[in-house]
Amino acid sequence: MTNAPPDYLVIGHLTQDLLPDGSVAPGGTVFYGALTATRLGYSAGMLTAAAGWAAVPPAIQVVGVPSASTSSFAHSYVEGQRQQLVHAVAAPISAEQLPQLWRRAPIVHLGPVLDECAETLIDAFPGALLGVTPQGWLRRVAGPLPAPMRPVPWRPAPELLRRIDLLVLSVEDVQGDEDVVADYARHCGCVALTRGADGVTLYVSGVPRHIPASPAQALDTNGAGDIFAAAMLLQLFETGDPDQAAHFAATTAALSVEGRGAEALPTRGGVLRRMRGEDGRR
């Protein structure tokens, strides 16, 4: 660990995707978020709980909570809809496990996937730009493992929502209930509702506007939502402009789905070239 906090700190479970061929791929908001930050030129750190974190690139600082297992998911598609089956759940994560130095990180991203982070973490970083992807607070494991997940309502107090600088959710996260997203936006100053290839509804001070998706030839959409959220949070830190940040993030996510795996993540230069209408892959 260095003598300075990471520029970007992401908190949540590092996960394993159990693939049909028997192989395992790393995933989770912490994985894709931290990779995005490093590709865009930031130092990154993650606070996670897992049985191990050898899959995390060495450029990313890791504070790991020991766990008997790593949160693991098997994915399948039924009538075009992704289905997830949970095979293992790692230990919970709390503010007490956070190094004191890391509490001064300027950009913090809370990314629960299985309710592993307490909402009280929202108040642990009063000086940071705080982003939240609340996917893991909107679902629970439905029974003994292996088991599917069931949606649950997330009703944070208005004062917690006011502390969040950027809230990013997908239409799937809220089961298509856009009224609840509008309710969040009454208290949270910047809310992004992602719609995949249909773009983003961006609420700023409660007022919605449409941000189009950046055109892409999609090969692998795994992690695209997490990549969007991290890129938008980082660009919001740089510019303070939600619209500009959302367009930048949409382009970053579009480039990421045009390849497979973490290697497809673009650099800052690649994103800017694509935004100018050039080939961001060069």
Locate each region found by the language model.
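A short, flexible beta-alpha/helix-coil linker loop
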Residues: 15-18, 137-138, 216-217
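Conserved N-terminal subdomain of the carbohydrate kinase-like
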Residues: 4-10, 15-24, 38-131, 274-282
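Short, solvent-exposed loop/turn segments at secondary-structure boundaries
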Residues: 20-24, 143-145, 181, 260-262
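Short beta-strand scaffold segments in enzyme catalytic cores
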Residues: 35, 73-76, 199-203
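Conserved phosphate-binding/catalytic region of the ribokinase-like
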Residues: 2-4, 153, 180-282
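Conserved beta-alpha-beta core of the PfkB/ribokinase-like small-molecule kinase fold
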Residues: 107-182, 198-199
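Histidine-anchored nucleotide/phosphate-binding helix
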Residues: 28-39
